[in-house]
UniProtKB/Swiss-Prot annotation:
Keywords on record: Amino-acid biosynthesis, Aromatic amino acid biosynthesis, Cobalt, Cytoplasm, Lyase, Metal-binding, NAD, Nucleotide-binding, Zinc
Name by which UniProt lists this protein: 3-dehydroquinate synthase
GO annotations of cellular component type: cytoplasm
HAMAP family: DHQ_synthase
Protein's cellular compartments: Cytoplasm
PANTHER family tied to this protein: 3-DEHYDROQUINATE SYNTHASE, 3-DEHYDROQUINATE SYNTHASE, CHLOROPLASTIC
Domain of life, per lineage: Bacteria
GO BP of this protein: amino acid biosynthetic process; aromatic amino acid family biosynthetic process; chorismate biosynthetic process
Enzyme Commission (EC) number: 4.2.3.4
UniProt-annotated binding residues for Zn(2+): E192, H256, H274
Function: Catalyzes the conversion of 3-deoxy-D-arabino-heptulosonate 7-phosphate (DAHP) to dehydroquinate (DHQ).
Organism from which the protein derives: Zymomonas mobilis subsp. mobilis (strain ATCC 31821 / ZM4 / CP4)
Amino acid sequence: MSSEVSKTVTVPIDLGNHSYKIDIGAGLYQQAVSILTPYVRNRRFIVITDENVARCQLPEFEKSFHEAGVTVDSIILPAGEATKSWHHLAELCDQLIRRGVERRDAIIALGGGVIGDLVGFAAAILKRGCQFIQIPTSLLAQVDSSVGGKTAINCEAGKNLIGAFHQPVFVLIDPDALQTLPARQLRAGYGEIIKYGLIDDPDFFAWCEEHGAALIEGDKASRLYAIEHSIRAKALIVADDEKEISGKRALLNLGHTFGHALEADTGFSDKLFHGEAVAAGSALAFGFSYVKNLASKEDIQRIIKHLRETGLPASLEEAGVKASGKELVAHMMHDKKMEAGRLPFLLARGIGKSFLDKEVNLEEIAAFLDSPLARKGTI
């Protein structure tokens, strides 16, 4: 996974006394030791990753440490969404305790969103808070889950229902890590990139329409631009509403209320990746907005067309979901955004004009989810 080292772009996350920065650049893995050492008081590194990343990327990562004379310890977990569980959380905490982890050691989450969420939550609760570093290796993690401090595991009732806000001390993003990703994982990550255009940036969505296919196919310039743009967009929102108090950060949940219900129906498994669920969920959010005479027919047609062109699901059928509207709404009842018995939804008045609606009728949602538009993307 070697490459020439490119110019490093730094994006600050301004959160007062727990602010941090994100470094983005091709070839940064080659400089990992020198970049990370300032964040570790006693120069002890513990890398936590999954079986897939361990096979493809861990050897080179460890090599850079060994060549610098720095010891690095590794913990390898199973790959897949099922790893975000009580069982694996307890097992990871036990392993870290047995290895004598200290609060100021560098616990490194090297992997995709699953590893980042699990390791971040373990760091949040272990010894009442250990520092950790995010090194995301999937496109989804690089543009979304590694930024903002949300950490969590899943449970039987739903996705990410058990967790904490716990910010990393640093995030290192090397786009070259994406070279070993399967095409489906890249498409899933792209599902989160599109979201930023749909929320409040119609020009960026237009850019996605023009460059999305090239990004997925491996165009380095497009990837670097999309990663930086997405991170800057999220950084502004997180700095303004870190813990979803004012409601602004809730905008980042576009597609997620529908999407999490789809993931629940497919058992939080690799049958439907998170980014795929968000893509389908975004189409559903705009579809419902169209039904409510908020968004135009042209907008929903553009979204469905682009999702299909980039290999992402734009309907329940394409996502492999057969549950009825009522069954999907039942999954939504455990949503974290539930407030006073009502579930807010991210809807839109057009591309780039998303808003939070706290007065949505769930019976109307259920009926919409049984419609041809939701089922087949037919409009």
